[in-house]
Each structure stands twice: as C-alpha cells, then as structure tokens.
Amino acid sequence: MIENVEFGLEIEGIPKMVRRRRSQEMIELVGLHGFENRYPKELSGGMKQRVAIARALAKEPEILLMDEPFGALDQQTRMFLGGELLRIWEETKKTILFVTHDINEAVLLATHVWVMSSRPSIIKKIVDIDIERPRDVKILSSERFRELTGQLWDVLRPEAEKALGARALKA
C-alpha cells in the first residue's frame, strides 16, 4: 500500500527517500501505520479511502478536492472517516473542497456549505457553519446542528422536488 501512496510522487520524479518519508508520514496521519505492506484486497473500504487521502496529501496540494469520497461506504464507516477527516484537517489546516449529497456530512465537516441548484447547476445559497472547532461526531445531537441541517433542507427541498419530481418526495 505504501507504493500506492508514493505513486503520484514517483510520477513527479521525487527521489525515493523523500517519497518514502512523506508517504510514511501521511500513512501515519490517516491512521494506517502497520498496514504499509498490505495489498488493496487486504484493506477494508474505509482503509482504501484513507489510502486515497494519504496519497492526495502526500503531494502537498494547496486544496484537497474530494468528490463524494465516502459515498460508497456504510454509515458507520462514513462517520468514522468524517471524524478522521476532521482530525486531519485540525493537524494540516488544508483547504478541502468536499462534494457530498449528505446534509449531515456537510454540516459536520464544513465551514461553509455551498448549496447547488438542480440543472442548470448554480450556487443557490452559501450557508456558514458556525459550529465551533475542534468538532467531532458528537455535534450530530446538538441543537445548532439540527437548526443548520433544517436550514439546508429548506433550501434543498425545492431543488430535490425539481430533480426527482414533487410526487417522489410526497410519498
């Protein structure tokens, strides 16, 4: 798995010693120390997502782009990885552009949520998430969390009705 994390650095011509050190640091950051020599088939879905995050962070991007990274995972793994991403953000302070269709995930992770309209997609509203950091999944039960998710649903519902058809949501 460590070679997977190193791959982007190798393509850029980064020397092997530097690649290995940086990759090892990122593997530790995402909590996969001890799994460096495992093959993809030996890793869970959540571990594979953490490898992808480590690989992206190893390249030291200014902005980390994440498009539905937890979409194919079960709810428990999503919550765990959401907590891990919050921890990683606290350590790195990297700007992360995170695309999700999950309102709870958006409020948990974001500083700002950009709500997009259905076709044609435009920014319909930007909602500032004013929940203090550091955060963890315990905020899911807070009153402010419920207020923000409700506010987002109020903006999203008309868009969902357009995209899915009003009858689908009334059923």
Where are the model-predicted features located?
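Conserved ABC ATPase "signature" region
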Residues: 6, 10-13, 17-35, 87
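Conserved beta-strand-loop-alpha-helix hinge in the C-terminal portion
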Residues: 116-148
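Conserved signature/switch motifs of ABC ATPase nucleotide-binding domains
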Residues: 38-41, 59
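Catalytic Walker B motif of ABC-type/P-loop ATPase nucleotide-binding domains
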Residues: 64-67
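Conserved H-loop
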Residues: 94-99
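Helical segment within the ABC ATPase nucleotide-binding domain
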Residues: 78-92
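Hydrophobic anchor residue at the start of the ABC signature
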Residues: 53
